[in-house]
Amino acid sequence: MWEVSKKENLDRKLIEVCRHFRIPGEYQFCEEIKVGNVNKTYKVTFEGEDPKNPGNMRLKSYIVQSVNTFAFKNPVQVMDNIDKVTEYIHAKDPGRCALHYHHTADRKTYIFDKSGFWRLFNFIPSVTYSATENLQVIRNAGLAFGNFQMLLSDFDASQLHETIPDFHNTIKRYEQMEEQIAIDPVDRVKEVRAEIDWLESVKEQACKLTQLQLDGVLPLRVTHNDTKINNVLFDKDTDEALVVIDLDTVMPGLVGHDFGDAVRFAANFVEEDSLETEKAGVNMEIFRAFAEGFLSKTAKSLTQPELDTLALSCLALTCELATRFLADYIAGDVYFKTNYDEHNLVRARCQIALAKDMLKKMPQMESVIQDCVKKL
């Protein structure tokens, strides 16, 4: 009985949210989409008249999300960034499949009430991949993120809010780790001396991207900042990339942040928390496939310093995440969700192993990028 009541309350709330966004027709049903662990996501379906066939009825679906305001402290700024970026992309390429966030009567892309922070956008029939070794899918993912970057290459990134300050400021991430080392709140530093020493030994290389940005060598651009392959929707029949999703972290950043984090996630031989750290490393076939797709769309709009530091960006983003995992382990596991006592340490060691392999393969990675650019 309680479950029925809970379902009825959810249905009522979703109908209320949809009416705020002026969704026509009669509510039919909803289903929770349990992908991602930050926001609550629902697919809602309405029945209404088909505008292309007057007199005929059709079912149309939408995505409704309840945004996690603990994770996103300034959700209004998040939505302002998303609205600006999605409208700009649509204006530049109106015929392309795109995310469209619906507006309320007072032109807001959200409603904020006692039940939470809600938004609604179009449902796009598609498939996603959490991980794959299919090189065409990887290439298409690179193309999708590259196209996202290309369409926004002339957008003034200063118009966007920095919703997560210093998110990819590797210098600050190192400082945060070093602060935890100095405090050593739960007496774990002695366990991780080897990891600390190695990360400190590559600090200058890892922080070079951030330093070049501070020196004015690398320009700030609109960046996605969560370029995992599962943030691309693919055509279920052809594996063509349709659109980049999950724009909550869109803000000013470096193009290398998006490229490097995508490679870090997709091209590792193992999962980022694998216990088999000896198997961690860069799959060069996947690296090449992603680079081919990404650069086919971006090479002509990137500066030479940006192109020259793309391979380095992979090392920078990997070391950055390693410092975050290690800092959290030293702090007593207060930030990242863990499944067992040494989970953050395992994560840090896996990223360090990946970074070590990146250092060995840096000449190969740089050569691949140069080859991709030459072929255009």
Model regions and ranges:
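Active-site activation/catalytic loop segments of kinase-like enzymes and analogous catalytic loops
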Residues: 252, 256-300, 316-335
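Hydrophobic alpha-helical bundle architecture
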Residues: 122, 293-314
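Short secondary-structure junctions
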Residues: 19-27, 91-97, 300-301
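Juxta-kinase regulatory segment immediately upstream of eukaryotic protein kinase catalytic domains
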Residues: 1-31
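Active-site acidic catalytic loop and adjacent metal/ATP-binding pocket
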Residues: 37-46, 51-52, 56-59, 63-64, ...
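ATP-binding pocket architecture of kinase catalytic cores
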Residues: 49-53, 57-159, 182
